[in-house]
Structure formats: C-alpha cells, structure tokens
A protein has these predicted regions:
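Conserved alpha-helical substructure of the radical SAM core
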Residues: 7-12, 18-144
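Radical SAM enzyme [4Fe-4S]-AdoMet core and its adjacent flexible, acidic
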Residues: 1-2, 6-12, 75, 144-145, ...
C-alpha cells in the first residue's frame, strides 16, 4: 500500500460523498486542540492518526510498491497491544490497519476483534483482491472507514498492480458503499496518467464515495527507489 499525500478530499463541488459525512466540525476542532497541545506541551504529545504497517505479506505485484518482494514479517497482536498502550494514543486517535495487505496477516481477525472491542476508532486499508474476505471483515468487525486502492481502469490496473483486481475493487465498493464510509485511494505515478485519475473520479461520483489522491514517492519501507 503506497503512502499518500492528500491533495483534496473532494475534486470539486459536484463530487458527492456517501450519506455518512467524512469529517465533522468536531473533528476539525479536536485536531486544532491537539495541535495546540502538541505545540505547547511537547512532553505530552498525542497522536491524531497512527498507521500500522503490520505485515509485509501482499498478493499484489505493484510497480509502485515492492513490499511483496520483502521477507514475510508480521507485527503480532501482542506487539500491537503494546503499541496501543502508549500514552500518546487516545480514544480519539484514528488507527489505520494496513500492510502489505492487512487481511493476509495470520492474526488479522484476532487483531480486528481486539480493535473492535478496545479501540473502535480504527480503519481498514485493502487492495480488495479477496473481496469476500474484505466484505466479511467489515461486516463483522466494524472498522470506522474502509480505504481501497484504485489507480485506473482495468488495463491500467493490471499494468500497475500486476494482476486483474479492478472488478474486485468495484465489487467491494458496490457491496459496502451503504454500510461503511469508503474512500478510493488513487496514486498518480509514472505507470498511470491524469486520464486514469479522471476515470477513478468518475467511479467515485458513480458510487457517491470519497476519493483521495496521492503522488508516488520513494519510501524505504516499501523499497520504492525509482
């Protein structure tokens, strides 16, 4: 899963998101207070967001991410519980579970069940290559938000990610769009174009879901150096 630089939560005023508001006024106020706290009390900093790359296992073969070439490693449920015990994490900290592909983690169900019970303010990121497993996980473990990767149409998807996953992403979006807030994650890279970005924007409009646009960049953890 590629790291994202948020360009705009919505492309323009005609792009409608789902019935569930992505952000409320209280979210902005809370983050403002958090920023002031971290600025004025550096010894008592709190996190607004924590992304946990809990596994290197992934069934995609992406050109813009080489994590699938790394040795298989996982953070255990016990590891995650230790992280969550940190004093910089509060009940308002949004925790993102990703990888690799998080649902391939050998303890994925136990981890999601723990978060559902002890820190329900968590999100799930997925490539949706196992659509039924993603659908079942969302319905059973109730993540606050689902982020799914879509970098272009069928042809671009296959070129960029090395597999036929486009229709599986659409299946998950069609099935869950009225059950959980969904964001399409588009990464602009040397392997796709602005035409692909326009395509993904139109998909977001069709299903009335959010879209996030990021720009490809190098990152040691993903072995992205080109």
């Amino acid at each position: 899963m590629q790291s994202f630089e948020l360009l705009s939560p919505l492309i323009d005023g005609s792009t409608k998101v789902s019935e569930n508001e992505m952000y409320k006024t209280t979210d902005y106020l809370r983050n403002g207070v958090l920023y002031l706290n971290n600025l004025l009390r550096p010894q008592h900093k709190k996190l607004s967001t924590l992304m946990i790359y809990s596994t290197t296992k992934c069934q995609s073969r992406c050109k813009h991410c080489s994590i699938w070439q790394k040795p298989e490693e996982h953070l255990s449920l016990r590891d995650l519980q230790k992280i969550m015990a940190s004093r910089c994490i509060t009940k308002n900290t949004v925790v993102g579970l990703e990888g690799g592909e998080f649902i391939l983690h050998p303890e994925s169900t136990a981890i999601m069940e723990w978060f559902m019970r002890h820190h329900p303010n968590y999100t799930l990121l997925s490539n949706c290559l196992n659509p039924q497993k993603v659908i079942d996980a969302v319905r059973r473990y109730n993540p606050r938000h689902l982020y799914v990767s879509l970098d272009g149409d069928r042809d671009t998807y296959k070129v960029m990610r090395g597999c036929n996953g486009h229709d599986k992403v659409i299946e998950v979006v069609e099935t869950l769009k009225n059950e959980v807030p969904i964001s399409l994650m588009f990464c602009l890279s040397p392997w796709n174009t602005f035409k692909d970005m326009d395509y993904v924007i139109r998909v977001a409009r069709k299903y009335e879901v959010d879209i996030r646009i990021g720009i490809y960049g190098t990152m040691d953890f993903f072995n992205t150096t080109a």
